[in-house]
């Protein structure tokens, strides 16, 4: 506190208003170095964060007061520290988000990320705490060496003016990640897995057995539960067709066929033999036929 204040001679020659301004500036430097005194930050930490439940690391991570770097502010120590911190945080992590839709149309987004063992536990918390202490020391040294005001030191762009340092860091990280905000709101704490492995004993015991009836009813239940919009129920459609078939008018009776007897007699061998026998008898008795089939020609 004494190092940030001016000398005793200058302090004695200053007006009360200038003394208050210098004390307030020094106090602001100290609060900025320790990350305290920001009411909006405390209110933001109390608010409910739905993404914290589905975050990769368990528990609440400590806030890192990272020093913002702009073109007119140069610091080799801070850049080396930030690069070292980024290398430490870059660990093999498989990020995976699964989107599911329930039969009622509700959307469920779950985070199934896989983390390494070194990133979880007390080691991660201890490393983050050490990194926070180093950054706080570097920032305090820079505040002690600098002689210009905080308003001149931090000159963010026009669209980021009027917000605190932590909010500016969060907004920049959000823009760098590019993840939409509505996905974070849909993440829940249950986190069901996308695939559940079957038990080995059941798999080996029921490998050769397949209940076709149970499989049919299972598929039928799934088919009935998941329907396309505008699809008619097949059972109702079948019953409607059956009612139309039953209500159809009866066909007209066809006219009966009238039987006409046939008097035609087919000549048989018996009748021909009787005719031949009669002709033979007439020739033997000298009886002339009544009508000749052809005229007799004179000989």
UniProtKB/Swiss-Prot annotation:
Keywords: Cell projection, Cilium biogenesis/degradation, Cytoplasm, Cytoskeleton, Phosphoprotein
Record keyword Methyltransferase present: no
Cellular component terms (Gene Ontology): centriole; cilium; cytoplasm; non-motile cilium
Modified positions (Phosphoserine) in chain numbering: 179
Single Gene Ontology BP annotation: cilium assembly
InterPro entries: Centriolar_ciliogenesis_assoc, HYLS1, HYLS1_C_dom
Compartment list: Cytoplasm; Cell projection, Cilium; Cytoplasm, Cytoskeleton, Microtubule organizing center, Centrosome, Centriole
Top-rank taxon, per record: Eukaryota
Keyword Cytoplasm attributed: yes
UniProt similarity note: Belongs to the HYLS1 family.
PANTHER family named among the record's database cross-references: CENTRIOLAR AND CILIOGENESIS-ASSOCIATED PROTEIN HYLS1 (PTHR34174:SF1), HYDROLETHALUS SYNDROME PROTEIN 1 (PTHR34174)
Role noted for this protein: Plays a role in ciliogenesis.
Name the UniProt record assigns to this protein: Centriolar and ciliogenesis-associated protein HYSL1
């Amino acid at each position: 506190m004494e190092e940030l204040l001016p000398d005793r001679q200058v302090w004695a020659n200053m007006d009360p208003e200038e003394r208050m301004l210098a004390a307030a500036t020094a106090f602001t430097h100290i609060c900025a170095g320790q990350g305290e005194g920001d009411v909006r930050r405390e209110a933001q930490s109390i608010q409910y964060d739905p993404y914290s439940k589905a975050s990769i690391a368990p528990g609440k991570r400590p806030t890192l007061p990272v020093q913002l770097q702009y073109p007119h502010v140069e610091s080799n120590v801070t850049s080396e520290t930030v690069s070292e911190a980024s290398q430490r945080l870059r660990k093999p992590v498989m990020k995976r988000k699964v989107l599911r839709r329930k039969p009622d149309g509700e959307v469920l987004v779950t985070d199934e990320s896989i983390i390494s063992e070194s990133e979880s536990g007390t080691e991660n918390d201890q490393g983050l705490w050490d990194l926070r202490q180093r950054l706080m020391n570097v920032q305090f040294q820079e505040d002690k060496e600098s002689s210009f005001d905080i308003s001149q030191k931090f000159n963010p762009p026009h669209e980021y003016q009027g917000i605190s340092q932590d909010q500016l860091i969060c907004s920049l990280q959000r823009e760098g990640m590019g993840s939409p905000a509505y996905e974070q709101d849909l993440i829940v704490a249950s986190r069901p897995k996308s695939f559940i492995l079957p038990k080995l004993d059941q798999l080996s015991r029921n490998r050769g057995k397949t209940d076709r009836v149970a499989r049919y009813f299972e598929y039928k239940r799934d088919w009935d539960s998941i329907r396309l919009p505008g699809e008619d129920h097949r059972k109702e459609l079948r019953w409607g067709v059956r009612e139309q078939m039953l209500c159809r008018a009866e066909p007209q009776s066809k006219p009966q066929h009238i039987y006409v007897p046939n008097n035609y007699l087919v000549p048989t061998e018996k009748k021909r033999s009787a005719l031949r026998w009669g002709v033979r008898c007439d020739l033997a008795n000298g009886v002339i036929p009544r009508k000749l089939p052809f005229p007799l020609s004179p000989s």
